[in-house]
Amino acid sequence: MVSRQEQFEQVQAVKKSINTASEEVKNQVLLAMADHLVAATEEILAANALDMAAAKGKISDVMLDRLYLDADRIEAMARGIREVVALPDPIGEVLETSQLENGLVITKKRVAMGVIGIIYESRPNVTSDAAALTLKSGNAVVLRSGKDAYQTTHAIVTALKKGLETTTIHPNVIQLVEDTSRESSYAMMKAKGYLDLLIPRGGADLINAVVENAIVPVIETGTGIVHVYVDKDADDDKALSIINNAKTSRPSVCNAMEVLLVHEDKAASFLPRLEQVLVADRKEAGLEPIQFRLDSKASQFVSGQAAQAQDFDTEFLDYILAVKVVSSLEEAVAHIESHSTHHSDAIVTENAEAAAYFTDQVDSAAVYVNASTRFTDGGQFGLGCEMGISTQKLHARGPMGLKELTSYKYVVTGDGQIRE
């Protein structure tokens, strides 16, 4: 096993090859990686079977689905890499140019970060997405996968590096930390001088540990306690469709809805219809029904467990939905501001003034009017695959694509000027 220190030194030694690579070279790299990923399908599936067998019974079925790969999912991962090829190269983009009175020309241009570290949990697709985005944005990358997905991740990285071996870029621009202990995560958090940026992707415990302990600059990809508020002026059919999609299409992802707020004027008519869609109809279709966690008012209209205070601060990542009845738009916004992780929140309403108030007052990375929160995604936003959803405000906010993985520098051109 190569030590972490050796890996940090290896990636530092070769980072310039990707930091300054042309768009043509980087695209060749990505295409080779995609081809070798598909070519290694058999090996990746064998590794994934080992991870699945080890994880079964230890994590929920929803989380197992995150971990699971088949040939179609591997092809989708390769397709995601190829989609990044089609995106414009951000490196070298001129952001601003100005000329001073003394004749100096100052150009602000986009440059690579250098080396980016990614700590993530059991999602194999993050491996290929992270590699594609970091390399296309001119960065080398150090990956640290969760233990549950390590065999799969190792097989994926092996395939990607075989692709790199067919290009002019050194395979060491991608490093996979082989040690999946907590110590390896903490080593990355302290790797100042080796990592220029650290991005955690996972649950609240992982993200909080990185944010609280890292001395390397961090972009926080926060958890998603995502709200949908059904206003008194909502279209009921529209609201039912949005909630069904936001909660059930993929409950294990961070843009899935976790909390429903319903105006009290709507509760009596709307909540029984929602129960029909999310519980009865799903049972009839052989699908897992939604389990409600209800406040005292909501429990008057539908069946479910009584909500505990922590239910409104929980990212369930499962077929569970916390429901609260509110007396006004203002109460809904106040609840969101008290409990939100500032990821994605939505209002369903036909009232333009209510929509404007909601979008002005809710301080989240993505705020929706009459649409599912499941659209908070780099691909859906036209950014290609994403590095994560930033819930902080400095440097990057919302889905992080190529530009969010870059910095800038000033190039000052003169003709012998000196400062008096």
From Swiss-Prot:
<keyword id="KW-0963">Cytoplasm</keyword>
<dbReference type="InterPro" id="IPR000965">
    <property type="entry name" value="GPR_dom"/>
</dbReference>
<comment type="function">
    <text>Catalyzes the NADPH-dependent reduction of L-glutamate 5-phosphate into L-glutamate 5-semialdehyde and phosphate. The product spontaneously undergoes cyclization to form 1-pyrroline-5-carboxylate.</text>
</comment>
<dbReference type="InterPro" id="IPR020593">
    <property type="entry name" value="G-glutamylP_reductase_CS"/>
</dbReference>
<dbReference type="GO" id="GO:0005737">
    <property type="term" value="C:cytoplasm"/>
</dbReference>
<comment type="pathway">
    <text>Amino-acid biosynthesis; L-proline biosynthesis; L-glutamate 5-semialdehyde from L-glutamate: step 2/2.</text>
</comment>
<protein>
    <recommendedName>
        <fullName>Gamma-glutamyl phosphate reductase</fullName>
        <ecNumber>1.2.1.41</ecNumber>
    </recommendedName>
</protein>
<dbReference type="InterPro" id="IPR016161">
    <property type="entry name" value="Ald_DH/histidinol_DH"/>
</dbReference>
<keyword id="KW-0560">Oxidoreductase</keyword>
<keyword id="KW-0641">Proline biosynthesis</keyword>
<keyword id="KW-0521">NADP</keyword>
<dbReference type="Pfam" id="PF00171">
    <property type="entry name" value="Aldedh"/>
</dbReference>
<dbReference type="GO" id="GO:0055129">
    <property type="term" value="P:L-proline biosynthetic process"/>
</dbReference>
<dbReference type="InterPro" id="IPR016162">
    <property type="entry name" value="Ald_DH_N"/>
</dbReference>
<comment type="similarity">
    <text>Belongs to the gamma-glutamyl phosphate reductase family.</text>
</comment>
<dbReference type="GO" id="GO:0004350">
    <property type="term" value="F:glutamate-5-semialdehyde dehydrogenase activity"/>
</dbReference>
<dbReference type="InterPro" id="IPR012134">
    <property type="entry name" value="Glu-5-SA_DH"/>
</dbReference>
<dbReference type="InterPro" id="IPR015590">
    <property type="entry name" value="Aldehyde_DH_dom"/>
</dbReference>
<keyword id="KW-0028">Amino-acid biosynthesis</keyword>
<dbReference type="GO" id="GO:0050661">
    <property type="term" value="F:NADP binding"/>
</dbReference>
<dbReference type="InterPro" id="IPR016163">
    <property type="entry name" value="Ald_DH_C"/>
</dbReference>
